Each structure stands twice: as structure tokens, then as C-alpha cells.
Amino acid sequence: MTGSTPEGARTEQEAARWVRGMFGRVAHRYDLANHLLSFNIDRYWRARTVRRTEKILERPEARVLDICCGTGDLVLALAKRGHAVLGSDFCHPMLVAAHSKIARRRAPAVLFESDALTLPLRDASLDLITVAFGFRNLANYQSGLVEMRRVLRPGGMAAILEFTQPPNAAFATLYNLYACRILPWIGGLISGSRDAYTYLPESVRKFPAAPELAGMMRGAGFSDVTFEYLTGGIVALHLGRII
């Protein structure tokens, strides 16, 4: 398997089914858990993603899609620039939460239910595709990159914001102590599902390191691939262009 590997999943289909069910169980408390467990720094990470994609967002007719959009936080951040942003996710309860937030804020956004590996979009139809903390959960990372590449126009950009292993060994040890011992306990109390927050650090441990993910993006056809570590390297933001 070349993607997310939840315990007990033997195929990509089983992995996707497990991830969909897990997010469905925590959707009602997902935002609260995220903000508390990240000490609200997740808002900064998304804002940084928007800033790094500004040149695309400044285009008057830019078409923008956030895949694995969850409860819509990055969709809302992107929509603040005035664009009608698309958001997709394959977990229905997460989309229900996103719809509610978008309606309350009257944001220019349209959501649809779809697996990120099989987007119902034409080739070369987008200028920007983003994903925040969802790429790691895909059942096949290479297929996800190829699909992102397929729907981008020449001159378009992909932005992947994802947890990663900190490059500093000492800091990584401290972070892993928090992620493996404290985070599952608190996340379980908040969300009612400890499984989701036990899966999180394990999935980060198995996820390709930032330099490896950059190489995978190049292999999928992206050019000018760069990445930056944020907050001591617990998160990395990857950018890649289509020439």
C-alpha cells in the first residue's frame, strides 16, 4: 500500500473506508479539538498557505479547489480573497459541518462530495488546488498527486499543508511525546473517539518526510517544487507549479 495505512486495513479501499468512518465520528467536535490541540496555531498555518498562494489568488478569474476540505477552514480562508472557492471531501458529516460554517459567514464557496483520487473535474480546469492535513490520509499518495496534476492548468499551483516529522532530533523527541502520549488522551476526551487521535501520530510517523514528498511531487510532474517547515518542523508546506 502506498498511502494511509490504518491498523487492520489490507487494501486501499479498506483504508479509505476506515478514514471516512473515523472522520465521520469526530466531525461534530473536530474544530474544537483541532484548535485546542494545536494551541490555535493551525489558524496561522492556514493563513500562511493563503499568503504563499497569493499570486494565483490575485488572478481575476482564478479557479480554486480545496480537497479533503473537512469542516471548511481553509476554504473560508481562501474565500476571504473574494474568489468563489470549491471545496471537496469524501466524508459527508464533515461536509455538513462545512456547509453550516460557510452559510453562517455567507462565504463565496461551493462544496461537493468526492474522493480526492477521482475528482469529477475536467483536465486542466483549475488554477490552484490546496489540501490541509488531508493528503496524509489518502489511500494512495502517488495517485493523489497525479490527480492534482491532472486538474491543474499550465501556470497553476498545488499547495500541500501537512504534518511531518521535525528535522531536529531533540525537538522531534519532545513533539512525539506530546503527539503519542498526550494528544490521544485529550483528543479522545474532546471528540469522544480516541481512535482518531491515536491514528494521527501514527499516520504522521508513516508519512513521507518533507524532502521525500517534494521528490514525489516532482515525479508526478510538478515543477519549481519547494517546501518550508513551520513551527519547528511539525508541519511542512509544499508548493509545486505546472509549466
Model regions: which residues?
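N-terminal, positively charged/glycine-rich alpha-helical extensions of SAM-dependent methyltransferases
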Residues: 1-31, 179, 190
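Conserved alpha-helix/loop element of class I SAM-dependent methyltransferases that forms part
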Residues: 29, 39-61
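Hydrophobic beta-strand segment of the Class I
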Residues: 30, 129-130
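Class I SAM-dependent methyltransferase SAM/SAH-binding core
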Residues: 63-118
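A short acidic, Gly/Pro-enriched loop at the edge of an enzyme's catalytic core
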Residues: 117-128
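A short glycine-rich, Lys/Arg-flanked "PGG" loop and its adjoining helix->strand segment in the class I
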Residues: 142-157
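C-terminal alpha-helical "lid/dimerization" subdomain adjacent to the S-adenosyl-L-methionine
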Residues: 164-216, 220, 226
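Core SAM-dependent methyltransferase catalytic element
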Residues: 223-243
